[in-house]
Structure formats: C-alpha cells, structure tokens
Amino acid sequence: MFDKLVVIDAKGHLLGRLASYVAKELLSGQRIVVVRTEAINISGSLFRNRVKFSEFLNKWMNHNPRRGVQHFRAPSRIFWRAVRGMLPHKTPKGAAALERLKIFEGIPTPYDRVKKQVVVDALKVQRLRNSRPVCKLGDLSASVGWGKQTLIEKLEEKRRARAKTYHDKKVKQADARKKELAAPALKAIKDKLAQFGY
C-alpha cells in the first residue's frame, strides 16, 4: 500500500480478517487509522459471543488481578487487542508497528473529511453466507459493560447530517455549473473555439 496514511472504515468487516490485514500492513511500515470499530461484524450470534467473552472475563492473575489480563470492553480496544495478538509486540519491531495504529469508535473530526478505504477480502458479504448468524462488535461491547454506545450513535447521526448537507451543496454546485456550460451565450463561444480545435 505505502501511502502516507491509510484510513479504513471498519463497518461490515469481519474482526479477525481485518485485524490480520492491518497487522501485516503495520509490519511493512504503513500508518493505519481504523474508524467505526463499533460496526465490525463477528461471526456467530450475540449469545454465543457473549458466552465466549464471559469465559475470557474469568481469566485473571490470582495473587494480583491488577497485574493480570486486561479485559477491554470498548470495541476499539477489543480490535486493538486482536491486532496486538497478530504482532510480535514484545520485540522492538512489533512495538513500533503497534504505535503506527490508531483506532476509533465512530469517525472523529480529522478523519471525517478524509477518503476512507475498505478491505475487500475482509468484508462480511465476501466471506460469509447470508444465512450465517453475525453480531456487531458494538452490541457485544455494550452487553459486557461498554457504556458509550448511545453517545457514539448520537455523534454518528450528527456527522451523517453534516455530510448530507455538504453533499447536497456539492450536487447543487455541480448542477449550476452544468447549466452555465449549457447556456446559449456560451454556445457561440464554444463553436468558435471548436473551429480552432479546442
């Protein structure tokens, strides 16, 4: 890839497949930002994934739980942990790769105006049958203690409203330009220029 910065919209991607792609790109030196992690898909029903996550919550260090397994609840941190598991994060190379990654719920201000990409090989529609049960990472996080889901949804609604007004304005400008170019006053000038090969 090797762009200055790659912004990936994680909506509709599968958790593990997207994490493996991101990990590989990070190791090659690419800087990556992943947005909308609350909309990542996990194969399997919400109930099944909650059972698996509750088993993970049971893991801790007996004599000092604060030093043991960190049980992240936010979707961004769950995805970060999945990527970390695919990197040699205890070596300098892996630690440097992990520092090149930024992950967010929703789309915060600097990245809402940046062109975003998708990873086609990691999309749910490419990899799973329609009949397969899936759940969203945001729903799983909210069911195990993440308390920011409603806030993120409100902020996303506001962002979508801003994006719609911006898009409508651009469409209106494009239509006005088309009308100007099709005006009869310009037709005579265009015909004159066409004689000279323009």
Swiss-Prot record:
A Pfam family assignment: Ribosomal_L13
CDD domains xref list: Ribosomal_L13
Keyword list, A-Z: Ribonucleoprotein, Ribosomal protein
Top-level taxon of origin: Eukaryota
Gene Ontology biological process terms from the UniProt entry: negative regulation of translation; translation
Family: Belongs to the universal ribosomal protein uL13 family.
PANTHER family recorded: LARGE RIBOSOMAL SUBUNIT PROTEIN UL13, RIBOSOMAL PROTEIN L13
Name assigned to this protein: Large ribosomal subunit protein uL13
Organism: Tetrahymena thermophila (strain SB210)
Source lineage: Eukaryota, Sar, Alveolata, Ciliophora, Intramacronucleata
Gene: RPL13A
